[in-house]
Amino acid sequence: MPNQHMLLLFNLLPVGSNISTWWNFGSMLLTCLALQTMTGFFLAIHYTANINLSFSSIVHITRDVPYGWMMQNLHAIGASMFFICIYIHIARGLYYGSFLNKNVWLSGTTLLIILMATAFFGYVLPWGQMSFWAATVITNLLTAVPYIGTELTNWLWGGFSINDPTLTRFFALHFILPFTIISMSSIHIMLLHTEGSSNPLGTNSDIDKIPFHPYHSHKDMLMLTIMMTALFIIMSFNPNIFNDPENFSKANPLVTPQHIKPEWYFLFAYGILRSIPNKLGGAVALVLSVTILMTMPFTHTSHMRSMAFRPLMQFMFWTLVTTFIMITWAATKPVEPPFTTIGQVTSILYFTFFIMNPLLGWLENKISITNM
């Protein structure tokens, strides 16, 4: 076909006419993934996975490598952008009932777990103070596993403490896992397109579909432009906004930072971990804080898919959003009153959403039947 349109593939993709801007975050995540893979590749060329040289190699990248500062800052800020987009993407899925497409939701949650692991390994690589101590604290949680905990930890560390073998394997994992994410993303998208997207009303879109291009493709491009503009503005004017000041000092196993904390995007899980005084209990709660998302398709009892017409669940949803922000904030503070109490209360409220979901669905069904 001589004049075949370049976007014919997208022309042939029918999409519901009423999907809102909240549906744009999937394409934004794909862009973030491409950006992270490219900048990561250029950083890996100059990076040295050695405890004596890694910190210096980051300094070398930012000072001596042409545009190295740009690659390093784009990669660091891009990770934060990635998590902002993914949390909004998940929130949209919860609000509009996208989780009822089970395969898509479960593959997405698996993707989130792999992404969090990748980001954690990446945070350790600069071998700054916070990198080292965050790695020590988080990997040490494996010792809470009954019977095999200590052996598991030593196996991960490659010795009896965090050392050169740990950094080497973390770099190897940080390099290889993005390719797993790319593969999983392809599966995620294929599973989505077997059934198609949901929409804000939670109804079947088959009766009213429009071509993806030019309508939704232009909408996607607008949001991508906004995201990239925000990324470059942050990179140009305040590149260290998401960084911890402690991480500008080289790792020293003999000096413990006053307050150990991971990157901001893990603080909600870290806050939940910290709110339980028992080590094993905290580790279980940490894992549950993410894996509990997998229960959503199986605990949905309401006759309505979307929360658009469910005021009680809307209240619970916005409580969850506020709780998420509160846990993140409390986890940045020292382990002392009132922050410990705030952390414990918000952790309970976080899990309350998932417990109340089936109960409120059942109650709303009762109310709607009574009013008929």
Curated annotation (Swiss-Prot):
Binding residues for heme b b566: 89, 188
GO MF annotation: an example: ubiquinol-cytochrome-c reductase activity
GO annotations of cellular component type: mitochondrial inner membrane; respiratory chain complex III
UniProt cofactor(s): heme b
InterPro entries attached to this UniProt entry: Cyt_b/b6_C, Cyt_b/b6_C_sf, Cyt_b/b6_N, Cytb/b6-like_sf, Cytochrome_b, Cytochrome_b_C_euk/bac, Cytochrome_b_N_euk/bac, Di-haem_cyt_TM
Binding-site residues, a ubiquinone: 193
Bound cofactor: record note: Binds 2 heme b groups non-covalently.
Residue ranges of the TM segments: 25-45, 69-90, 105-125, 170-190, 218-238, 280-300, 312-332, 339-358
CDD domains for the chain: cytochrome_b_C (cd00290), Cytochrome_b_N (cd00284)
Binding annotation for heme b b562: 75, 174
Main location: mitochondrion
Swiss-Prot/TrEMBL GO biological process terms: mitochondrial electron transport, ubiquinol to cytochrome c
Alphabetical keyword list: Electron transport, Heme, Iron, Membrane, Metal-binding, Mitochondrion, Mitochondrion inner membrane, Respiratory chain, Transmembrane, Transmembrane helix, Transport, Ubiquinone
Gene3D superfamilies xref list: Cytochrome Bc1 Complex, Chain C
Topological relation to the membrane, as annotated: Multi-pass membrane protein
Record flagged with keyword Membrane: yes
Described purpose of this protein according to its UniProt entry: Component of the ubiquinol-cytochrome c reductase complex (complex III or cytochrome b-c1 complex) that is part of the mitochondrial respiratory chain. The b-c1 complex mediates electron transfer from ubiquinol to cytochrome c. Contributes to the generation of a proton gradient across the mitochondrial membrane that is then used for ATP synthesis.
Assembly mode: The cytochrome bc1 complex contains 3 respiratory subunits (MT-CYB, CYC1 and UQCRFS1), 2 core proteins (UQCRC1 and UQCRC2) and probably 6 low-molecular weight proteins.
Family designation: Belongs to the cytochrome b family.
Protein known as: Cytochrome b
Gene name as annotated: MT-CYB
